[in-house]
């Protein structure tokens, strides 16, 4: 996994590459069944965090009549790739991982003074200092422990569900 002290880095699942598309042809992997010619370990990967600004800049604005400037692109180094080909599925194949503290620091820097997309604001529209979550996933070491852990989470006042309920 990405090191905690190495700045923001991404670790890519082996099937993430299938979500890239060719901007010139507007085709994805699933359109052509050809893996994009991208080496995630060597090629620079540009990331746009301010997706609202991106879509506003590509669609002619936000409806106010003003042209929206394209948002800044960031090059995020790759710390590693999950083993496997695009045909090897696992529950983590389409995920991108990062050190959560490094990611939060980067988001706070990028959106300084503004709300990070998806985050709540106070009555004045100002962002809170903390990051809020509306969902977490808890992995349990053994099926025998799922109900106990689920009950502990529910006793803390949170909703909790598991696939074990369906078995």
Residue ranges and their predicted role:
Residues 165-167:
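N-terminal membrane-entry
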Residues 1-161:
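Basic-flanked hydrophobic alpha-helices used for secretion and membrane insertion
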């Amino acid at each position: 996994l990405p090191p905690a002290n190495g700045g923001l880095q991404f670790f890519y699942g082996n099937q993430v590459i299938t979500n890239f598309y060719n901007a010139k042809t507007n085709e994805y992997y699933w359109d052509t069944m050809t893996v994009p010619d991208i080496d995630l370990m060597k090629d620079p990967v540009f990331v746009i965090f301010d997706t609202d600004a991106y879509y506003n800049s590509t669609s002619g604005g936000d409806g106010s009549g003003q042209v929206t400037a394209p948002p800044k692109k960031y090059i995020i180094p790759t710390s590693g790739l999950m083993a496997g080909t695009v045909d090897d599925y696992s529950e983590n194949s389409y995920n991108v991982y990062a050190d959560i503290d490094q990611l939060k620091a980067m988001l706070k820097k990028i959106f300084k003074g503004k709300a990070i997309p998806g985050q709540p604001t106070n009555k004045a529209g100002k962002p809170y200092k903390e990051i809020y979550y509306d969902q977490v996933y808890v992995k349990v070491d053994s099926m025998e422990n799922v109900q106990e852990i689920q009950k502990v989470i529910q006793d803390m006042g949170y909703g909790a569900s598991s696939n074990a309920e369906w078995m």
